[in-house]
Design a protein with these regions (language model features):
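Structural and coupling elements of P-loop NTPases
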Residues: 1-168
Length: 168
């Protein structure tokens, strides 16, 4: 896990880390919504093909509106941004991917493995809402990460062999 600075002054440092990520969690303020820097990060995540989860933070602040933020995420970032607390979750997911639509039409449900595959292919961007400061619904985000992330398979030559000297 890497925690990169979100401030625009650290863009160069942050961009270097994106090249090695398996997944990203893009944190967006519910009070500020999608900002210019958010769009820049989104383009970079797309460029480096990084599957992305979204956590909309500060939902405990007065005047925040999850439906409004969700509509903004869909219009500004991607139609694949899906609120994973939605009552219509399967229907929304089915609209993001042909394999998900086929599975939903056949069984009326979707498996975690198929959802995880759509996330890994950047067809679906799971959105979770909460307050990091108050630990409100952070557990839901963690459960979502656990359920909807595919284990990455790396080639054997990715790892450095262990080399021992004469002393062991």
């Amino acid at each position: 896990m890497l925690d990169t600075p979100g401030h625009v002054d650290f863009s160069a440092e942050m961009e270097r880390t994106l090249q090695v990520l398996d997944y990203a969690i893009l944190v967006i303020s519910a009070t500020d919504g999608v900002q210019g820097h958010t769009r820049t990060l989104w383009r970079l995540l797309k460029h480096y093909n990084v599957p992305t989860f979204i956590f909309v933070n500060k939902m405990d602040m007065q005047g925040t509106d999850a439906e409004k933020v969700q509509a903004e995420l869909k219009s500004e970032l991607s139609d694949g941004c899906v609120d994973f607390s939605s009552q219509d979750l399967f229907e929304e997911l089915a609209m993001c991917s042909e394999p998900l639509l086929d599975e939903f039409m056949e069984s009326g449900e979707l498996t975690d493995a198929h959802i995880a595959q759509a996330v890994a292919q950047r067809e679906v961007f799971p959105c979770f809402y909460g307050s990091a400061l108050k630990l409100d619904r952070v557990d839901t985000l963690i459960q979502g990460l656990s359920r909807f992330m595919c284990e990455r398979n790396y080639p054997d030559d990715f790892f450095c062999p262990r080399i021992q000297d004469r002393q062991g």
